[in-house]
Amino acid sequence: MASVSWRAVAVAMVVVLLSLQWFAKGYPEEDLVVRLPGQPTVGFKQYAGYVDVDVKAGRSLFYYYVEAVKQPDSKPLTLWLNGGPGCSSIGGGAFTELGPFYPTGDGRGLRVNSMSWNKASHLLFVESPAGVGWSYSNKSSDYNTGDKSTANDMLVFLLRWFEKFPKLKSRDLFLTGESYAGHYIPQLADAILSYNSHSSGFKFNIKGVAIGNPLLKLDRDSPATYEFFWSHGMISDELKLTITSQCDFDDYTFASPHNVSTACNEAISETENIITEYVNNYDVLLDVCYPSIVQQELRLKKMATKMSMGVDVCMTYERRFYFNLPEVQKALHANRTHLPYSWSMCSGVLNYSDIDGNIDMLPILKRIILNKTPIWIFSGDQDSVVPFGGSRTLVRELAQDLNFKTTVPYGAWFHKSQVGGWAIEYGKLLTFATVRGAAHMVPYAQPSRALHLFSSFVSGRRLPNNTHSSTDE
């Protein structure tokens, strides 16, 4: 009996010690993803689950977090948000672009993404706002939302997420995303900096903002699309001249109807009829199937044109099929409320404010930079939805407003002895870079160049202006 009692006590002590050791690591055991169905063996940990952002309303956001492949005790933390608005960062960023896995062709397994950004950083993906993916609210009125409430919920999310992961509170934090995240990320960064200025306790260790092909200012981004079409030989001189002379983009808004002339709307409609029937707007060189994330950009384009467009969904099925497998949802601790609809790349219940798409992000970006937070804007050069020309112009205007001098002149940057794109730096805090051969979803179209750009960003390195080999692989 004594021997049995001793063994029982010993076992109990081991359990307690293991529990203490686990929680000392600062990670929530209940959110650990032991293994995803069909997942290859990897050496890093994954976590997924919910964070309540409004307990009274029953509003919760779903997240997926992956540790860095190497040196997890010293790597920074990077948040990634996809756009839409209303599209999933898990179906998009995590499992189509920059996360550690891609679904296989049959939609039942996973394969390793050798260019995953968790080579350089811990990665956090959030389905935001509520109504996207597995994020939800018990109040249907919460699905009528916009930029301000989305930023507020994300601030609350991060504060409570760090309570789950206290070990990461002091890590360098980078905020990244693409497309309509050109609205999400700046407003979240602004909210974080405001929180830091008023907090006498915990402060976010925010170190930088990077956004790909971002919607920043509609009256610059919209005309850039038609300039891109014309410069690539996709529309005629006559149509380009009509748009230039008849469309006052300073008065162009997302809300329908556009506050523009009939001649302008007719010219835009003619352009869309020509382009969308034959060309993938998100990669004008691509004529094959495209990933599920294209749905998020379709939303952005529809908001601007109010036109019906066809989408090649051949790769959408893989993601949708995989994430609707019961065993996958169980492994991810997802869909805990048994939502009355299946998981989809973009929300069918969200009613996001069209008007918020008109908000000028440049004043917010200026405030972020005045807080000494670096900003990188990067653009795939084959994207016509938010073309690099508009983004480059906006970055230059922002630099002029800040009275920044050019600290690195415009020129090529290199990766693996090839031109990776072109870049310019202003005031040592503001960088614009193109990614050669990339499209709207830069990490998907050019994964190696995207990883090199990202690694440079989080490491505080400038993009190399010579053919020396990259240091991130």
Curated annotation (Swiss-Prot):
Transmembrane segments: none annotated. Keywords: Carboxypeptidase, Disulfide bond, Glycoprotein, Hydrolase, Protease, Secreted, Signal. Disulfide bonds join 87-346, 247-264, 289-314. It is found in: Secreted. It is an enzyme of class 3 (hydrolase). SUPFAM superfamilies: alpha/beta-Hydrolases. InterPro entries: AB_hydrolase_fold, Peptidase_S10, Ser_caboxypep_ser_AS. The active site is at residues 179, 383, 440. Gene3D superfamilies: 3.40.50.11320, 6.10.250.940, alpha/beta hydrolase. Expression not detected. GO terms for cellular component: extracellular region. Residues 1-26 form the signal peptide. Its main location: secreted. One of its GO terms (molecular function) is serine-type carboxypeptidase activity. Pfam families: Peptidase_S10. One of its GO terms (biological process) is proteolysis. Glycans are attached at residues 138, 259, 335, 351, 465. Probable carboxypeptidase. Belongs to the peptidase S10 family. This is Serine carboxypeptidase-like 42. It comes from Arabidopsis thaliana. The lineage of its organism: Eukaryota, Viridiplantae, Streptophyta, Embryophyta, Tracheophyta.
